[in-house]
Amino acid sequence: MLGLGLTACGSSPKGTNGDQDELAMLIGTYTNGSSKGIYTFRFNQETGTAVPLSSAALPNPSYLVPSEDGEFVYAVSEMNDSTAALSSLAFDRETGELRLLNTVPTFGADPCYVATNGREVLTANYSGGTMSVFPLQKDGTLAPADTLFQGSATGPDAIRQATPHIHCTVFSPDGKYIFATDFSADRILRFVMHPDNPIPHASLEAVGIEADSGPRHLTFSPNGKFAYLITELSGKVIAFSYDDGCLEQIQTITADTVAARGSADIHLSPDGKYLYASNRLKEDGIAIFAVNPENGTLAKVCLLYTSDAA
């Protein structure tokens, strides 16, 4: 399954209709215009064509993620008030139909990121400066938020970092920790997971980032040995080695060469050989890097523009 949102995508190897060349593609949107919510397509990897299948009405589903088995989809409603929410939907990969199971409040405005480990679902609530944790029920529905983290620190950018912003929450590949990017405080936070309480109230600062960086999204390599962070304001990709909760910086490389202060998403190819970092606001495009399999360092391959205007 390939899941696409305005700022995100996730995948699993299964296609639709038994055809390994085809993937189920889901696109999240903002609905303050003509969009209804989530749209599903059948995407052919060989031809690049997408056939529309279905849609589901949901307010501002700007970020979504499928469950590992592809049976469920978890999508935010990115609202800047108390209506901000997370929804669980059942997904039929054959027909593309989505069926709403339940919706629960995030208790933080503008949820902008979702992650799941099959037991819990996390949201990063950007404007609320909070992280929410939702236990998953056996039927795929979401229980109310179990634990919240409230950010408090701010940063040097008087506009972008004036209030706390949590931008991304991810599970570590060993399943022991949760990492959250503290955008305004220029740091990555680490939380220890426990069977009876997935997040303690106290957090440990895993690593500080250079001031005025704006850490946005974090992703781990398929082998679990490395992690990569994209910084929105400084436009860098920072590579880390990873071992039992510890992130050690090994490289910093530029993704945004025009100082647009709008770098956004970061993903690795399924085989871990390439890394993709998106840039916005000026010369929109995808910076592509080759990954050294031995030490995790990056070498820039090219910048692929998304518009001829660049």
Describe every region a protein language model picked out.
Residues 51-56, 100-104, 155-159, 203-208, ...:
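A short beta-strand motif characteristic of beta-propeller blades
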Residues 42-47, 90-95, 135-142, 192-199, ...:
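Short loop/turn segments immediately following beta-strands, especially the blade-tip
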